[in-house]
């Protein structure tokens, strides 16, 4: 698929980098002139994806999170968040609302939020090999 512009970031799975990641994506997406609602949805989806990497992919040690964004034709923002952490054993169960392996302080709504805020959402994972979240958002053309 052809793209008009792209960025790739790599950063350690520190909680302080979650805000950096969502802000970087919001700044990158701004070239598409999104509405405030679209920008908020994108920031939230990226926040959930990166937080999952920080909390679940690397529970015992720091690891690397890779974030790739591309501008595709027809005003589509393509986002990939990837880790090489512990992976997900049962993707179907993990995608169910309210399911979490993170304890009582976790809501278990991350994948549900990502799926509802983005136009498309795909999840690929294998135990011991990491997880890739691939999301796209088709943005309105503002007049």
Question: Where are each of the predicted segments found?
Answer:
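Conserved beta-strand-loop-beta-strand hairpin that lines the nucleotide-binding pocket
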Residues: 1-8, 53-143
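Conserved polar catalytic motif of the HATPase_c/GHKL fold
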Residues: 48-52
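Conserved short strand/loop->alpha-helix "switch" segment adjacent to the catalytic nucleotide/phosphoryl-transfer site
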Residues: 23-47, 106
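Generic, well-ordered alpha-helical segments
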Residues: 17, 38-46, 61, 69, ...
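STAS-typified acidic loop motif
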Residues: 8-19
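Generic hydrophobic-segment detector
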Residues: 11, 23, 35, 39, ...
């Amino acid at each position: 698929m052809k793209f008009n512009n792209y960025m790739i970031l790599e950063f350690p799975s520190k909680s302080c980098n979650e805000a950096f990641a969502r802000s970087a994506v919001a700044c990158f997406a701004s070239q598409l002139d999104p509405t405030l609602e679209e920008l908020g949805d994108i920031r939230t989806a990226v926040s959930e994806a990166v937080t999952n990497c920080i909390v679940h992919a690397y529970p015992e040690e720091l690891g690397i999170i890779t974030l790739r964004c591309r501008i595709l034709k027809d005003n589509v923002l393509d986002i990939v968040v990837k880790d090489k952490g512990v992976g997900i054993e049962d993707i179907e169960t993990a995608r169910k609302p309210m399911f979490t392996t993170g304890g009582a302080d976790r809501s278990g709504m991350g994948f549900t939020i990502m799926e509802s805020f983005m136009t498309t959402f795909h999840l690929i994972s294998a135990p011991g090999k990491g997880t890739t979240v691939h999301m796209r958002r088709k943005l309105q053309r503002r007049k």
